[in-house]
UniProtKB/Swiss-Prot annotation:
This is tRNA U34 carboxymethyltransferase. It comes from Vibrio cholerae serotype O1 (strain ATCC 39315 / El Tor Inaba N16961). HAMAP family: tRNA_carboxymethyltr_CmoB (MF_01590). Keywords: Transferase, tRNA processing. It holds the Pfam family Methyltransf_9. The gene is cmoB. It comes from the Bacteria. Belongs to the class I-like SAM-binding methyltransferase superfamily. CmoB family. SUPFAM superfamilies: S-adenosyl-L-methionine-dependent methyltransferases. It is an enzyme of class 2 (transferase). One of its GO terms (biological process) is tRNA wobble uridine modification. One of its GO terms (molecular function) is transferase activity, transferring alkyl or aryl (other than methyl) groups. Its EC number is 2.5.1.-. Carboxy-S-adenosyl-L-methionine binds at residues 91, 105, 110, 130, 152-154, 181-182, 196, 200, 315.
Length: 323
């Protein structure tokens, strides 16, 4: 069983978040009561990871921690074996006590692309929607965020996050909650909201943009990252079935069309700050994620297309303000 008491304590310290306490405890109680497949096994393995206070932590340039005296080889091997029971590791990388968790995604590359364009996170209250295992939340903390909350319904991501948290000294300035944004009240409370890799999974993308706006304070900033296609402000791809072997995908606008969507839902100062074709080096199979990955999803004869014949993955980052 997870103990979310620390989450409630952190929320209570922010008056603008206290409305959340009207619904969150019951939601998490209901979540705990459900059967979650491998969760019991993962929880048993999570308990094998000791909580320690690393002598060196770097969240500014990476997500890394170590002591001046390295772990004994046997202890390091035991820890690595436990961490590998939480396979697949999709978002990272992590460098923890001599163990390099080489994840499917080089999430640090995305962070490097967006960081020069966003408002400084120092002392900000931040929400990361669809946060995965929390890699970017640690990087937000490294930029000085006061408190970071992430939401993602995946049990495995929660386990991976809690494993990393233990190895980073049990830092309580960042929390991952197993929720979707549709379960959140309209808090109008966060200085910065991130939504990265979520929009194309939404049947109603404009509703998702409105949900994001309803979490921001007036003047707050949205960082939106999603799959896009080339084209003008009228261009939108709706895959017939799968896209790069993904089933649950719906709308792929051009970056210009997405800018129009943001303006239509009431955002201002909308900027397209980056467009990038995902390289085979940024998303690939590794020792820590042994399933198929991007190289298996693009046409081997023409890597500019997916195996279904659609344009290969292109991702855009847009930044917008809530008036």
């Amino acid at each position: 069983m997870f103990n979310f008491a620390n989450v409630y304590q952190q929320i209570a310290q922010h008056p603008q978040l206290q409305l959340w306490l009207n619904t969150l405890p019951q939601q998490l109680t209901d979540w705990q009561a459900k059967q979650h497949g491998d969760l019991d096994r993962w929880m048993r393995n999570l308990k094998k990871i000791p909580v320690g206070q690393p002598e060196v932590i770097d969240l500014k340039n990476a997500v890394a921690a170590h002591n001046h005296q390295p772990l004994a080889q046997g202890e390091q091997k035991k820890l690595e074996a436990v961490l590998k029971t939480f396979h697949p590791w999709r978002k990272g990388p992590y460098h923890l006590h001599g163990i390099h968790i080489d994840t499917e995604w080089r999430s640090d590359w995305k962070w490097d692309r967006l960081l020069p364009h966003i408002s400084p996170l120092k002392n900000r209250l931040v929400l990361d929607v669809g946060c995965g295992n929390g890699y970017h939340m640690w990087r937000m903390l490294g930029e000085g965020a006061q408190q970071v909350f992430g939401i993602d319904p995946s049990e495995l991501f929660l386990i991976q996050f809690e494993a990393v948290r233990k190895l980073l000294g049990d830092d309580q300035r960042v929390h991952l909650l197993p929720l979707g944004i549709e379960q959140m009240p309209e808090l109008n409370a966060f200085d910065t909201v991130f939504s990265m890799g979520v929009l194309y999974h939404r049947r109603s993308p404009l509703d998702h943009l409105l949900q994001l706006k309803n979490q921001l304070v007036a003047g707050g900033e949205l960082i939106l990252e999603t799959l896009v296609v080339e084209g003008d402000e009228h261009t939108v791809l709706v895959p017939f079935d799968r896209y790069a072997q993904m089933r649950n995908v719906y709308f792929f606008p051009s970056a210009l069309a997405l800018k129009v969507w943001l303006e239509k839902t009431g955002f201002v100062d909308v900027r397209i700050v980056d467009e990038n074709i995902t390289s085979l080096g940024e998303q690939r199979t590794t020792e820590w994620m042994t399933h198929n990955s991007l190289p298996d999803y693009v046409d081997p004869q023409d890597p500019s297309k997916t195996i279904e014949g659609y344009p290969a993955p292109r991702r855009a980052i847009l930044i917008a303000k809530k008036p």
